[in-house]
């Protein structure tokens, strides 16, 4: 189950912030943001049967390790997104991420459910589903904390460097809350030039926090690739993963 937890940790934790990036930083509507995520979904659909065929021929070890490594590369690539990057810059990395996740998801299912006794197949499937949810929850919480810490450390310095009015603790907390989801804390009464400066600082700070979160997610995916090396032949020639 460890591999499944790490997979969902990296995937859900990282994707949680992409919605804020696409909608709040780039101003896309939910449909536009969803369209940018479609390449990953498409590659999952295309890659799953191919991964299944490969796993049937060579076992799950190589596909899982290769998939987690590819996912780590994609997450590292996403860490390079800046506030002024084009939303379309995400496409190639989402394609790689989808291709990387396909063999991992198929391989994990094959190892967990396929190697369980017939009478326990339902239990094995339930455990896999639970591991996926735990991993996603942990990823969102941990990477959210990492991003929040990065924003908290960077925002006051950037704010002061721009010679903006000093903030009291309550105001600073409100600004951090807005910036943590990629929003700029400006109102209709904010002078246009000041609003532009605040918006630039907010988006750049959010992008910096997202950069750190994606680096952590890439590291987790790489750890999953290393764990995938533990896969070894099981009883009866089947492939079993000792750490699941």
Model-derived features: where do they sit?
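Transmembrane core module of solute transporters
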Residues: 1-123
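Generic "edge-of-domain/loop-turn" microfeature
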Residues: 83, 101, 220-221, 236
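Hydrophobic transmembrane architecture of multi-pass small-molecule transporters
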Residues: 111, 132-232, 238-244
